[in-house]
UniProtKB/Swiss-Prot annotation:
This is 2-hydroxy-3-keto-5-methylthiopentenyl-1-phosphate phosphatase. Keywords: Amino-acid biosynthesis, Hydrolase, Methionine biosynthesis. GO terms for molecular function: 2-hydroxy-3-keto-5-methylthiopentenyl-1-phosphate phosphatase activity. It comes from the Bacteria. InterPro entries: HAD-like_hydrolase_phosphatase, HAD-like_sf, HAD-SF_hydro_IB_MtnX, HAD_hydro_PyrdxlP_Pase-like, HAD_sf. GO terms for biological process: L-methionine salvage from methylthioadenosine. It comes from Exiguobacterium sp. (strain ATCC BAA-1283 / AT1b). CDD domains: HAD_Pase (cd07524). The gene is mtnX. The lineage of its organism: Bacteria, Bacillati, Bacillota, Bacilli, Bacillales.
Length: 216
């Protein structure tokens, strides 16, 4: 039996949700209602995020990337936490509802590409179009977009101890099957509502301290 860590990116590894930051900077006002519908779960993640990105002109692709790379801040303790997972022999995968054009550049030098699972954006048309290489399998009907439970079924052994780290509705379904959940933001209230045991955190130093305390 081994330990497998599945970690969110936006708002978890990074201080801000980068899709929200991108929309706030470049999208017309219609994005706000779409975002609210996703967060209150009246619109699926795939449908809502897809519609949000369709508001962005493709010819601004480089501006989007440059903006995010210049503003993204990694959450305190992340690099040290990665080193600790490696020293313990844990497998660490980033499973993100974010987009490849910013997730991969930000994690370069920290997480190998084969351990990053995220969405793809096609900028070949007039507006951005999200494609979904990790869509829901037959066991999930939530229209997740990047389906974290589906990915877990593919890469996590049934005998593994599964640790999930996340902050929002996109992490909720995978949190339901985790052995240990580290939560911040909206994920805390979702876990509380469903009675899912979780450990609140603000930085990765908090997670490291808790893991040492329980001798994980």
């Amino acid at each position: 039996m081994s330990t497998h860590v599945i970690c969110d990116f936006d708002g978890t590894i990074t201080e801000e949700d980068n899709i929200i930051a991108l929309m706030r900077r470049f999208a017309p006002p219609e994005w706000v209602e779409l975002k609210d519908s996703v967060l209150n779960q009246t619109l699926s993640i795939r449908e809502g995020v897809g519609q949000m990105f369709s508001l962005l002109p493709s010819n601004q692709q480089e501006r989007y990337r440059e903006f995010l790379q210049s503003t993204i801040t990694l959450r305190a303790g992340f690099v040290e936490f990665l080193q600790e997972t490696q020293s313990h022999g844990f497998r660490f995968d980033v499973v993100s509802g974010g987009m490849d054009f910013f997730v991969h550049p930000i994690l370069e030098g920290h997480v190998a590409p084969e351990h990053i699972f995220c969405n793809h954006v096609d900028f070949s048309g007039e507006t951005a179009r999200v494609t979904w290489p990790h869509a829901c399998d037959v066991h999930c009907l939530n229209d997740c977009g990047c389906c974290k439970p589906t990915i877990a079924r593919q890469i996590v052994s049934p005998t593994d101890t599964l640790i999930v780290i996340g902050d929002s509705v996109t992490d909720f379904e995978i949190a339901k099957r985790a052995d240990v959940v580290y939560a911040r933001g909206q994920l805390i209230s979702l876990c509380e509502a469903e009675g899912i045991r979780h450990v609140p955190f603000e930085t990765f130093y908090d997670i490291s301290a808790y893991m040492k305390g329980v001798n994980v």
